[in-house]
């Protein structure tokens, strides 16, 4: 082996191991974990993992041997089947990715229709259709007697398994196997991203309108209170009066697609003491925010009271979901297009002009496509919290070890936490530390008392 073959051996080994064990782990997680098994949409992930697993076992292993040795040692018979397995399994992997994008689009954009019509039986029909189309495209070279042939290299005298596809088949199979599914995925994921942005902006607008409406209602209620007191000749206490006033406030928010209804009821009860104006405003803000926190917990989970939506902290928090959507869709589509677009472009041009590309170029774009089977378990499974939890259980059961799962959402949210939340967490920490110290002092006091009592009971 020369100096170039050793790095290739290491690279091919890493890709094969990732594809093999990653997809095995996905299948095991869905089969063993009850919560994952109950979700019908995970059947698409099982089908994707099976197709990528077959790519690693039936295609990548033999391609690695062929490219490292520089010749084909497995004979004419398996050369034909190897090319057919390559086309079938890679097409199934791409079509499964397209089916996953369709499933996610219907699940998010039309959830009621999805819940009503999408079940295990229909998902199984789609998976069977995916594999039938893939098998039909992959079996065509065997049925019509084209696609591969073992020839003898004139320079080395060693056998070489060559792929020879007619131009009509190369164009047709590339359209069905990649270009049409890629077009569908780009359109659907773009629409999903735009839908998510529109949904987030709609929620932000509704929250701003509801907050403004509540403030107007409270102001008008206070005006009516002052007017009634003036007409009755009652005295109005100044805002900084030490008297107390209890205010019971109920806020009900009902969202619909076209309207937002807010009902506010303020019942003041005057007593001998009244609270200051600042405490009243703070109690009202806290009550309002508690309702908003219930209605939109992901946005207001770490805040104590509603803030101005135009402040930098609120703006950063509102952009977290948008950044996550861009990152997720960018990783999904970026990895898919980078891996497969060069291969299918070269595939069509190679059928048209066979001598235009070198063997190294063909090997590079081929393994770039195979790398997608190694990346799919990482993209579609490990970034999912339920799958990470299932992977942890499997690894603990098999190897007897464990890891501390990082909370990505918590780390991102902590970056944009409001200063009052940080101070509150610090105060809670100081309180817990002081409580711990007090408990230690109390325990030490008890021990001293016990020791003193014991010393008194010992006879001299």
From Swiss-Prot:
| Molecular functions per Gene Ontology | dopamine neurotransmitter receptor activity, coupled via Gs; epinephrine binding; G protein-coupled serotonin receptor activity; neurotransmitter receptor activity; norepinephrine binding
In which compartments does the protein localize?
Answer: Cell membrane
Q: What ranges does the Extracellular topological domain annotation cover?
A: 1-10, 64-67, 147-168, 350-361
Q: What is the recorded membrane topology of this protein?
A: Multi-pass membrane protein
**InterPro entries named among the record's database cross-references:** GPCR_Rhodpsn, GPCR_Rhodpsn_7TM
Q: Which GO terms describe its biological process?
A: adenylate cyclase-activating dopamine receptor signaling pathway; adenylate cyclase-modulating G protein-coupled receptor signaling pathway; chemical synaptic transmission; G protein-coupled dopamine receptor signaling pathway; G protein-coupled receptor signaling pathway, coupled to cyclic nucleotide second messenger; habituation; mechanosensory behavior; regulation of locomotion
Query: Compositional bias (Polar residues) spans?
Result: 440-460
**UniProt tissue specificity:** Expressed in PLM and PHC mechanosensory neurons. Low intensity expression found in ALM mechanosensory neurons. Probable expression in AUA, RIB and RIM interneurons. Expressed in the RIS interneuron.
| Superkingdom of origin organism | Eukaryota
**How is loss of this gene reflected in the phenotype of the organism?**
Shows normal light touch sensitivity. Shows rapid reduction in reversal rate during habituation to a non-localized mechanical stimulus, or tap, administered to the culture plate. Does not affect the body bend swimming frequency of animals. Restores late-stage body bend swimming frequency in grk-2 background animals. Does not affect dopamine-mediated inhibition of both basal and serotonin-induced egg laying. Rescues learned avoidance behavior in cat-2 background animals.
Please report which protein family the annotation says this sequence is part of: Belongs to the G-protein coupled receptor 1 family.
Q: What is this protein called?
A: Dopamine receptor 1
